[in-house]
Amino acid sequence: MNIFSKSNLFVEIVGSVIFWYPYIMSIIWMAGAIIFSHYREKEDNIDLNKYKWPRISIILPCYNESETVEETIKKLSSLSYPGYEIIAVNDGSSDNTGKILEELALKYDKLRVINCLENKGKANALHMAAHAAKYEYLICIDSDAILDDMAPYYLVRQFLENGERVGAVTGNPRIRNRDTLISKLQLVEYASIIGLIKRTQRILGKVMTVSGVIVAYRKKALMSVDLWDRDIITEDIAVSWKLQRKFWDIRYEPRALCWMLVPETISGLWNQRVRWAQGGQEIIFRHAGIFKDWRQRRLWPIYIEQVFSILWSISWIAFSALTIFTAKYRQDILVFFSFSAFALSMLSFIQLFISIKHESVYDNIMKYYIWASWYPIFYWIINAFVVVRALPKSIMSTIRGGYATWKSPDRGTIDNDEEKESTVYTVKSKQKIVGKVIAMLVNVFMSFYMFLVVYLFISGCLGYNDSFIGIVKSAMKITNDDIRYLSLNTIRYFVLSFLILFVWKLYNLKRFGRLNRRKAPNNTTKEEMLSLNLVNNETYDLLQSEKVIKFKHNPIRELGNVR
């Protein structure tokens, strides 16, 4: 039976929710980012002589990274930070990553290598590195990433300045490969969406996750939550929630830059996003009990938003399918989608310029923003399909349990023959002619579309009409009154969001900001690490003392046998 044959009230209600959720969330992200930038992102240069910089351990988990790991270690070895060690862990790679690491250990004094022939996943590799680390502060980066020279200073400073309660500090990932259509879209996504989200979440007081590609941990904090979860596919999301539930603070430091490679194929991007969504959903299942504890209330907004995101994704796909194939009111649906596309496109353009204000300080990427200012619209569509695809995987993974092992990621098609200065982190990609042509056509079409949107918006606000505008408005079923309605509501919701977040920030500062509930913890001792019952005394001593150590089997106690 046609569910819309009796009345289109259901269509209107569901359609309104589907439209207003991404619209309101985008406005909230913009408001939160502005507040964060004003209070915590003012330009400043670190006085390197002001602090007594503690020694740090830089951890590099590796799996099938033979093409990238040497460059990463070379860059790490030349950092200006006064005292650090590098610990690279090969987690059962099927290529020659282990051999390369052992050779590099002979070349670089700061490098220590753990070569485990059994693949047990990234979290397990981090367990090995944490037991091998000699210092209290751990900086973890991906083995294809390049750490900016000033990044360790910015990360560590967060622990030193009123950071007694800080358990982790997440940095600001930047994209190295930015030539292909897919990599350019991700470049815009990280800056105009992910960057705004992280800033807003910090205003709320909690974050959904650290960035696994660049994050600094306090070892004492990690030990208090039994390190990383080895049975969840996204160990960075999992440990973020564990730390925050133990009342450790997680900070976002956008000045700590790390340059990474991103997927350049549709399948690679799809697999990455499904993995992220699956990990987020596994966290939702695992931490459903936070509503039983009033002390966890600052995590509630993050949790609720994640649940609503899942429900929205399912609703959007179901709504779209039903309205296309069964709805009686196809004309109304056409008008709805036309207006929604226009509204979200205009908001994407505004979001673009706000993100430019924040991100242009760190990376000259304005030309990419103009090129793909329309991407936030597609972000919501892509995310809907990703969330729905990941849902059964996360349910099955939660039921089955076991190690969350990793697969070889898509790092793009990098031109390794390209010569570049040591301070240039971006790289060229090997593109086929077809890919270049497709990217150019998409660029031309979407640029023209965004021009129409902006032109239509300005003319609607000013009440201007001509023959061209009339044709466009008629085709899109939009009137000047619709545009004015949209403009006024955008302003109202932005002001309301700004005020709510501003008051929330003041409350957080007064209620939590100056509390001294936890004195600066002492450095983690050997006895404390052994108390986790993950390695025996002999293995711990080997991990601490050997420059290169090889394990045929996993030295970390198996899942199910801990404590």
Regions of interest found by a model, annotated:
Residues 74-83:
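Short, acidic, metal-binding catalytic loop of nucleotide-sugar glycosyltransferases
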Residues 54-57, 85, 238:
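Cell-envelope/extracellular polymer assembly enzymes that use nucleotide-activated donors
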Residues 70-71, 95-104, 150:
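Acidic helix N-cap motif at the loop->helix transition within catalytic regions
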Residues 35, 109-115, 123-125, 129-131, ...:
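Long helical/loop segments within the catalytic core of UDP-sugar-dependent glycosyltransferases
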Residues 82, 90-99, 118:
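A conserved acidic beta->alpha catalytic loop
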Residues 31-55, 289-302, 326-425:
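Juxtamembrane C-terminal module of membrane proteins
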Residues 1-74:
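N-proximal low-complexity "stem/linker" segments adjacent to membrane-targeting elements
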